[in-house]
Amino acid sequence: MLRAQGYAADKPIGMAAQQTPAYLAHAGIEQRLGQPLPMAAIFTDETGRTGPLSSWFSNKPVVMAEVYYQCAMMCPQVQHGLTTGLAQTTLKPGQDYQVLVMSIDTMDKPANAVDEKKTFLSEAGWTNNPAAGNAVHFLTSDQASIDAITSATGFHFVRVPGPDGKMDQFAHSSVIMFATPDGRMSKYLSGIDYPARDLRMALLQAGDKKISNPVDLLILYCCNYSPAVGRYSVSIVRILGIAGMITLVIVAGMIFLLTRKPKGLAPSVAGPALKS
């Protein structure tokens, strides 16, 4: 499980190490790859449109974030990391993928979702991009649907007290998730910084698209996805394997060139001996 990052787990600079609060043991991520999402669960988007989760799925992979809109700590960083990374990929929102940002707080309403979406589109440079506007949605819901989606995605969170003592904040992990077009969990990326390369590979895999770009093929082959850490990492064994095959081809080619007989040259025939 990827444990909670941020909130109470972060200590102010200079503060002595303290024991992690017991309630944080219940916050984290349990990666449920292949798990079907609750497509019948009811949500409401930033426009006020209400419908089953399937309403926001089509024939494209979906990148998802589970946050709460009134968060002033880690959630904005997760969304900023996502917008920055997506804007740097060559994939296009609406054409290649959809984005769903879902609130885990029943106090969040469509009005909050409107503001969050405006910020998201602005940070990605998509304010005047109609395709992006139609591909990015911020969802709110009741507790039953929130429980259904977070259970399916393995997103564990706990309500915790804020600075004023009110139980109006949440401890949770910083993570984004990827779902297949038919609504099954595909990948998780942890942290608050999501490199464009990682996002592109995760979306391509989630969409189960044919990999026709040689660069993508090489990267996917040279990289292992580690469910334990939620990151792509370079596999040294695979790189050495590729290097070994390339070396073998080069050596075989050199041997062939050095040993083949030149064409057009007849064998020499000894002529008559010269008389002195």
Model-derived segments and their meaning:
Residues 21-24, 109-121, 141-169, 210-211:
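Thioredoxin-like thiol-disulfide oxidoreductase module
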Residues 12, 16, 162-222:
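Extracytoplasmic/lumenal ectodomains and periplasmic regions of secretory and membrane proteins
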Residues 79-146:
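Structural microenvironment flanking redox-active thiols in thiol-disulfide oxidoreductases
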Residues 226-247:
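Juxtamembrane/start-of-transmembrane alpha-helix segments at the extracytoplasmic/lumenal side
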Residues 1-40, 44, 252-263, 272-276:
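N-terminal targeting signals for export/organelle localization
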Residues 36-38, 58-61, 94-99, 133, ...:
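Extracytoplasmic
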Residues 52-82, 99-101:
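Short active-site neighborhood of thiol/selenol oxidoreductases, capturing the structured segment around
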